[in-house]
């Protein structure tokens, strides 16, 4: 054990000579080996380290000791031919593995009993070709499979490029001099406006469908008007039936598409968040007002009850 510090000191003091080069690619395994010239002396220990000052391993016969976070999974050691050759294999090369590796032999003479230690070292420069990394990336990116595509037709057809002219004939308003309410009845064929007191009855016929024939597709818009005469004036209601929902390119989250039942069109609207907030605020205000009235009433009644009990005791 006393020789180990001396041997480590010798390793740090010896300068390596120009070394041969070994070139490998990233991901490959590199095997580095060296042969000793003195074949007569006894090998006490062999060592591998990486310049400038990183000790990889120390080996004595079959015992191997790793340093500086090196493990046998990364670097394997072998010493065949009766310690004449020492070999290491660096697995899965990375750019950090490039550098100068030095192998060293520590030997003693077999003919005398002196403590003299002979030292031999040999260096090898390992070059890791980093250009292969980009080549691997290109190969991998070129072998990727494109995602599967579906041949189904879209739910809508964008007819923004289609040019069409719509002409809508607006029916004449119905004038009713009677200042009475009007009942509106819907039939499957048309929309009738009937006055409860007037003798005259008028029927608004639905205009002819409007057809847009562009790019082999048809868009039909049916527009009907309902005119109601009241005491405040004439109110005209417009109802639109779109029988080409397939070509609707805009989705409105606030409204529901018109629902057609028996030829009549009814537009159904969803409540917005603002409406619910207003309803909730009004309800909360009513509840708070009721609680306040209850508390005031309870306080007055309790005060009178206490006053009445006090007077009775007196």
From Swiss-Prot:
Disulfide bonds join 34-103. InterPro entries: Ig-like_dom (IPR007110), Ig-like_dom_sf (IPR036179), Ig-like_fold (IPR013783), Ig_sub (IPR003599), Ig_V-set (IPR013106). It is a single-pass type I membrane protein. Induction: Expressed in the early phase of the viral replicative cycle. Glycans are attached at residues 37-38, 69, 112, 161, 253. Gene3D superfamilies: Immunoglobulins (2.60.40.10). It is found in: Virion membrane; Host membrane. Residues 17-121 form the Ig-like V-type domain. Keywords: Disulfide bond, Early protein, Glycoprotein, Hemagglutinin, Host membrane, Immunoglobulin domain, Late protein, Membrane, Signal, Transmembrane, Transmembrane helix, Viral envelope protein, Virion. Residues 1-16 form the signal peptide. Residues 303-314 are intravirion. It comes from the Viruses. Pfam families: V-set (PF07686). SMART domains: IG. The chain crosses the membrane at residues 279-302. The keyword Transmembrane helix applies. Residues 192-217 are annotated as: Disordered. Glycosylated; contains phosphate and sulfate-substituted glycans. O-glycosylation is required for hemagglutination and hemadsorption activities of infected cell membranes. GO terms for cellular component: host cell membrane; membrane; viral envelope; virion membrane. Residues 17-278 are virion surface. Heterodimerizes with OPG040. The heterodimer OPG185-OPG040 interacts with components of the entry fusion complex OPG143 and OPG094. Heterodimer with C3/VPC protein; disulfide-linked. Belongs to the orthopoxvirus OPG185 family. Prevents cell to cell fusion by interacting with and directing the viral OPG040 protein on the host plasma membrane. The OPG185-OPG040 complex associates with components of the entry fusion complex (EFC) presumably to avoid superinfection and syncytium formation. Via its interaction with C3/VCP protein, protects the infected cell and probably also the extracellular enveloped virus from complement attack. This is Protein OPG185. It comes from Cowpox virus (strain GRI-90 / Grishak). The lineage of its organism: Viruses, Varidnaviria, Bamfordvirae, Nucleocytoviricota, Pokkesviricetes. The gene is OPG185.
């Amino acid at each position: 054990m006393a020789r180990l510090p001396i041997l480590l000191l010798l390793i740090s003091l010896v300068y390596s000579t120009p070394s041969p080069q070994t070139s490998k690619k990233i991901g490959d395994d590199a095997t580095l080996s060296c042969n000793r010239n003195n074949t007569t002396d006894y090998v006490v220990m062999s060592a591998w380290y990486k310049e400038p000052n990183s000790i990889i391993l120390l080996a004595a016969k079959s015992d191997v000791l790793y340093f500086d976070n090196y493990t046998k999974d990364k670097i394997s050691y072998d010493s065949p031919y009766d310690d004449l050759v020492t070999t290491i294999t660096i697995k899965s090369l990375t750019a950090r593995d490039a550098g100068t590796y030095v192998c060293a032999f520590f030997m003693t003479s077999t003919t005398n009993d002196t403590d003299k230690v002979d030292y031999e070292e040999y260096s090898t420069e390992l070059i890791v070709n980093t250009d292969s990394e980009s080549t691997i990336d290109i190969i991998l990116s070129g072998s990727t499979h494109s995602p599967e595509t579906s041949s189904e037709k879209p739910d809508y057809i964008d007819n923004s490029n289609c040019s069409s002219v719509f002409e809508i004939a607006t029916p004449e308003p119905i004038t009713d001099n009677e200042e009475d309410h009007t009942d509106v009845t819907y039939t499957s064929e048309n929309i009738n406006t009937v006055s409860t007191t007037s003798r005259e009855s008028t029927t608004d016929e639905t205009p002819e469908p409007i057809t847009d024939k562009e790019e082999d597709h048809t868009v039909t818009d049916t527009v009907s008007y309902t005119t109601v005469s009241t005491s405040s004036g004439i109110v005209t209601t417009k109802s639109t039936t779109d029988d080409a929902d397939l070509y609707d390119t805009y989705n409105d989250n606030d409204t529901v598409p018109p629902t057609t039942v028996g030829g009549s069109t009814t537009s159904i609207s969803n409540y917005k968040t603002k409406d619910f907030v207003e309803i909730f605020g009004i309800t909360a205000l009513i509840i708070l007002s009721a609680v306040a009235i209850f508390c005031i009433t309870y306080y007055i009644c309790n005060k009178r009850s206490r006053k009445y009990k006090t007077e009775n005791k007196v």
